[in-house]
Amino acid sequence: MVGGRKAFRGTSVLTGIDVTVEDGEFVAVLGRSGSGKTTLLRVLAGLETLDAGSLEWQDTSGGARPHTGVVFQRALLMPWLTVAENIRFGRRFAAHRASFENDYALGLLRRFGLDGLADRYPDQLSGGQAQRVAIIRAAAIRPRLLLLDEPFSALDPAVRGELRSWLAELAAELGITVVLVTHDVDEALELADRIVLLSEAGRIGGEWRLEAGLGRADPDRRAEILTHFGHQVGQQV
């Protein structure tokens, strides 16, 4: 994205955004409520368009958007379908049919420890289980790009910690590009290869690249990010 701008009713939510996501990279977009991070993700997903600037996709046919899976804050599972049927739901869409394989989709349930839930309905799942299923459903269409909009924010801290480890394993094993929107500094530090901070009016307020096994547990790096993030967020974390 180069010079990305977006406004709603005259209020800027993205202001001159220049950001690149490399193939296979895990990027965390960090920011307070109202910083424009969800709008940025919706633009990447094709659910919103920029008012100005450009969005370019490398190494895709004709520069088209890569095959993309999206998971929002709520799992949005179909309540009348079982977990297995929800996982297979993606094949109903023409854009996904060519890449969708039933055996692969159900294999993901086994591979990531959810096969015991296959016959359950969404109202029989915990919040953490529902979000895992939503992520597997998105992964089942074999996306090159997985977009996650604060998928763990409504869960309690213990469950969030467990799911972060699970997500890191999934992203690494499937080798997909991930953009995660979050307001949680520790979540960003644990998962991301790179952190992009959005500040007021959707401006980039900082960017940090994390080397495996080094920057993630560095208290000075965490303090630096919190300083940029702002005093209010520091209190929350």
Model-derived features with residue positions:
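Helix-to-loop junction immediately C-terminal to a conserved catalytic motif
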Residues: 45
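The feature captures the beta-strand-to-loop junction immediately N-terminal to the Walker
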Residues: 30-32
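Conserved ABC ATPase "signature" region
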Residues: 99-117, 169
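Conserved ABC ATPase signature
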Residues: 121-125, 129
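ABC-type ATPase nucleotide-binding domains, specifically the catalytic core motifs of the NBD
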Residues: 9, 49, 81, 85-101, ...
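A short, proline-enriched helix->beta-strand linker immediately N-terminal to the Walker B motif
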Residues: 140-144
